[in-house]
Amino acid sequence: MTPHINAPEGAFADVVLMPGDPLRAKYIAETFLQDVVEVTNVRNMLGFTGTYKGRKISIMGHGMGIPSCSIYAKELITEYGVKKIIRVGSCGSVRMDVKVRDVIIGLGACTDSKVNRIRFKDNDFAAIADFDMAQAAVQAAKAKGKAVRVGNLFSADLFYTPDVEMFDVMEKYGILGVEMEAAGIYGVAAEYSAKALTICTVSDHIRTHEQTTAEERQLTFNDMIEIALDSVLIGDAQ
C-alpha cells in the first residue's frame, strides 16, 4: 500500500486506464470489464481491476491537474509494477478544424507547468507518448471505423486562465486540444521507465463555446474507451 492507494500487492494489471473522475473510472469498469473488483478507494479515488475480452486491465481515477495525476501514476508504476498508463479524458479545442466530439490521440504534450522542468534539472523535456501505444490506438480506431486526430496537446496548470491570448499561440502551433494532465503523465512514465498515452474527447470548443450534451459526451466517451481498450489487445499482439 501507499499513502494514496490502499490496494494489496498484485491488485493492479500491468495496464491501467486513467480518467480524471473516479466515478468515470467506476463507470468504465462496470460498463466495459468483466469480473470487476474494487481494489482501492483512498480519498474516494476509486480503482478497479477486471478483464476485457479475457485480458486483465485496471481502471483508476487520477484527479485534476499534473500534481494529482503524477502522484497516482508514480505510485502505480513504482509500487504496483504498472507498465503502461492510458489517460482517457476530455479536452477543449482552440482550432476551428478540431470539432466537438473529435477524438484526439496525444502524441506529445506541451505545458505551462514547471513540474517537468523540476524533474529534468530546469531543462525543457519533450513530453511524448509511447509510439507503439499511439500506433495501436490509431489501428484500433481504424478497425472501428472511427476517425481520430493525432498530434500535440497542451497541459495547462490553470483551468480558468486569464491568458486568453495564449489560445492564439496554441492555434498557431497546431495544438489539437487543451487539458491538464498529459505532460505530467508522460514525464512520470519517462522518469520511471514506463509507457504512457493520452486519448481525449473534445467536449468543449474554446473559440465557439460549443459544448457537448450529456448524451453526446457519453456516446463519444464510449468510443474513446473502446479505442483505448482495443489498443491494449493490439499492443499485446505486436
From Swiss-Prot:
Keywords for the protein's UniProt record, in alphabetical order: Glycosyltransferase, Transferase
Superkingdom, taxonomy of origin: Bacteria
Pfam family membership, one: PNP_UDP_1
SUPFAM superfamilies with a match to the protein in the record: Purine and uridine phosphorylases
Residues where a purine D-ribonucleoside binds: H4, E179, M180, E181, S203, D204
Positions bound to phosphate: G20, R24, R43, R87, V88, G89, S90
Active site as annotated: D204 (proton donor)
Enzyme class: transferase
Enzyme Commission number: 2.4.2.1
Sample GO molecular function, one term: purine-nucleoside phosphorylase activity
Site, Important for catalytic activity: residue positions: R217
Family assignment from sequence similarity: Belongs to the PNP/UDP phosphorylase family.
Protein function: Catalyzes the reversible phosphorolytic breakdown of the N-glycosidic bond in the beta-(deoxy)ribonucleoside molecules, with the formation of the corresponding free purine bases and pentose-1-phosphate.
Subunit record text: Homohexamer; trimer of homodimers.
Name recorded for this polypeptide: Purine nucleoside phosphorylase DeoD-type
Origin species: Haemophilus influenzae (strain PittEE)
